Amino acid sequence: MKTINENAPQVSSWQTYRRLLAFAKPYRLLLVAALIAALIEAAGTTGFLALMKPITDETFIYKNAEVSRWLPVQIILLFVIRGAAGYITDMAMGKSARSIARDLRVKVMSKYLRLPGSRFDSEPVPSMLIRLGSDSDQVAQAAVDAVKVMIQQSLQVIGALALMLWHSWQVTLTILVLAPVLAWVMDKVARRYRRISHSIQESGAHLLQAADQTLSSHQEVKIYGAQQSEMERYSGLADRNLRLAMKVESTRGISTATVQMIGAIGLSALLFVAGAQALAGRLTAGDFVVLMTSMLTIIPGLKQLTNVQNMVQRGLASAERLFSVLDSPDEPDQGQVPLTRAKGLIEFRDVTARYPGQANPALADVSFVAQPGTVTAIVGRSGSGKSSLIKLIPRFYEAESGQILLDGHPVQAYALADLRRQIALVGQQVMLFDGSIAENVAYGEMRQCDAGQLERAIQGANAMEFVAQLPEGLQSHVGTKGGRLSGGQRQRLAIARAMLKDAPILILDEATAALDNESERLVQDALHKLMPDRTTLVIAHRLSTIEHADQVLVMDQGRIVERGTHQELLALGGLYSHLHGMQFRERQA
């Protein structure tokens, strides 16, 4: 069976970031407002630094009472404006970031629902949840939150440097000699963060996957005494995640210490050169205080600009994981043949199918015809290819070779949506969603059905006898995955869903295999009401349930090894007869 190619070409950080910024376009007005507010906030910081000169010179040296009275008012006004601008920046950036995360989640979720079935075999659901959860948040942080920090701190650093140049270009140029060293440090930090970020994202997905497997199988874990081994496995994964996290902390600590050391060298240079300028009479005490406070503003700004690299690189690593999903090809859907309601003639012609990475085919040279309105039973040992066969009809997977036809046309000739409207599926593992009974029966495109149709479907599926006893009737909630209902009740709701759909093709995948005798009787009775006038394919575990099938296909190792009616196959004395005899002896025992 065909799969998708997940080996995406390598792209640079800038290409990834540029593509990421495209998600910010719908919010550009918010971002422009945030940028203007950030400029005002940075100007407020620079203005406060500039006030250091009159505060020092006019208040403490020249004793200017008039200036001293107005300076506190100016400082208060400055910080009111700066605070308002900071609030606008935070709100606009926050709204943009959360909106981008929401858009990414919806886009990736929509993409997952358009991917072929092979994707769900190659990527575990916990990994998908990581992409929809923390990956989307970290991408939003990289796209907006990191930009906010970079803009705010960069503007403040630029403003402080401009102020320093204004008061003493000689001192400022002396400090700027350290800029290449700082740039080298930031580049090294960014590269290391990106390497570690990829590993951390994968490690988090493995942790979630391990927890999901263990907790969802808690009964098996307890009954087989596997708590210790599962905890050791999870602990090992958690330890690896911790080691990677500590590498991030180590990088952050080293980079912070390095930036602070560079800042200390800069301060020392400032003191040395400014002292010489002051002795020469070219620098007042106010100028010196401005230079000093500006430098003390620059150092934390540079520190934050270095630390924000972690946020950016983690976001870029998450973006690459999300883009690998968005860039995956959708299910092939180029069908043009119109299809309103199929007659139900299904034909397999020499169909071979293979799962990715498997040497032996799941199906090999399978050929048969299912006439409209007939029942075709598919039986065989576990792993013989029964489920693989029926998954090809709605094109959950694609065949490697051969043809599958519906009403004389290859199934690829129909649009996927039209093809799947012709099929109702009732499986052994019924999937109910956390909602009401009515919402689960009238599911998907059937949401617009009227109350009469819904009740007739539930009545026909022998489900009304238990639905009527529930406190809220059709509006009763079924719980997560239908956990508030028994297996037989869930199965009857699945049959009601199929009845409501009224599709010309019905697929039953071991629909009664896990039920007790009473539940099986009710479900079989409901199925007998559902099957007439439809092309029905039944995967049967209990051979007694398919004795009246129009044809029985016996599969072994991906091939049809016998075919005929129940009586013909018993008379043949082959594999079917052997399986039937085994089940008969089990029932007698």
Curated annotation (Swiss-Prot):
Coiled coil: none annotated. ATP binds at residues 380-387. The chain crosses the membrane at residues 29-49, 70-90, 157-177, 261-281, 283-303. It comes from the Bacteria. Residues 32-314 form the ABC transmembrane type-1 domain. InterPro entries: AAA+_ATPase, ABC1_TM_dom, ABC1_TM_sf, ABC_transporter-like_ATP-bd, ABC_transporter-like_CS, ABC_transpr_lipidA, P-loop_NTPase, Type_1_exporter. One of its GO terms (biological process) is transmembrane transport. Pfam families: ABC_membrane, ABC_tran. Belongs to the ABC transporter superfamily. Lipid exporter (TC 3.A.1.106) family. In MsbA the ATP-binding domain (NBD) and the transmembrane domain (TMD) are fused. Homodimer. This is ATP-dependent lipid A-core flippase. The gene is msbA.
